[in-house]
Amino acid sequence: STDVGAYHLVRILLENKRTTEAKLAARRAWVYIDMGYRIEKKFQKRYRKLLRKKDHIARLDRLLWKRRISASLRQLRRMTHDFQWLALARIALMRREPGVDYAVSKVPKHLIADPGLVYERVRWRRKKRLYDSAIKLLHQAPVPGAAAKKWWSERRILSRWLLRQDRADEAYRLSSTHRQTHGIGLAEGEWLS
């Protein structure tokens, strides 16, 4: 569905006193639908009482996984400082900005193992050719739930690098936890492991 359609669906549900359905529709739309600036502002203003903290967290996480940086930065206003630091660190890593170590150091301890942050740290290290450091971090990474294909991409690239370094055992350990269930990802994962 579209952002405008979701906005009007919630409005109609509320007008018809279907509050529970309106809450669910608003929360689902807020978390899963990309919204342009104007409709996002309108949606937030009109339906903010229907949204919970966890809806804002889930929206921010999804926007960051999709690399929707402008929308993520707008979302920061609705977040606690802890999640602001987390998002800013993820964005700094995505953009390969200077001072990423400082940005990561500002992330509170209880969020340092956030899968999105760990993923961006692995990716940043790989792109900076800090392969061994990226591999070490990847071995400590949480089981990929969200963005399994992105995680697999990093595992695949680093496994191939290990093979080129004649480190087949390490490549096997890294690729054997690919968690791909179909398609080319499964084929590559099984071949590498």
Segments and roles (model prediction):
Residues 1-193:
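Alpha-helical solenoid repeat scaffolds
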